[in-house]
Amino acid sequence: YLPQEFGFYPNLSVKKYLAYIASLKGLKNKVAERRIDILLETTGMKEHSLKKMKELSGGMKRRVGIAQALLNDPKILILDEPTAGLDPIERIKCRNLLGELAKGKIVLLSTHIVSDIEAIAKKVFVMKEGKIIKEGTVEELCSNIPCKVWLYYLNTDEAEGFISRFKS
């Protein structure tokens, strides 16, 4: 499980934090060490493994969160707003990583960002009050709910003006 905001001990290194979480999940030391090494490599955090958690950027913390969610190799991965608060570049990196790591798993994803869903899921189920109300690909779902989803492509020159309209 990857909550939108997860707690961590700020003075623990990335590696020690993951070892601590692995012990809470009941992983044996040797198994935990192997999984941590694999996940540090996979998430691109190997070179930062000795940094303290408080020294990490938002994107790095999110990657550590993904690693902790995958420590015990779950069959079902629950992600709550996995790219919330990330800048556009980190958002793309994060969802590409999740797309790779989610292969062969059931992923329950809570997000309001359609592009995150597109990058991670082949088939989407929309739930309301615990019941499935729609299912299909992102494209199918978006075409079936006109006036609810908008997609607009900006060139670099337009982006600044567009973004400034939404700043307070």
What is each of the regions a protein language model found here?
Residues 77-80:
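Catalytic Walker B motif of ABC-type/P-loop ATPase nucleotide-binding domains
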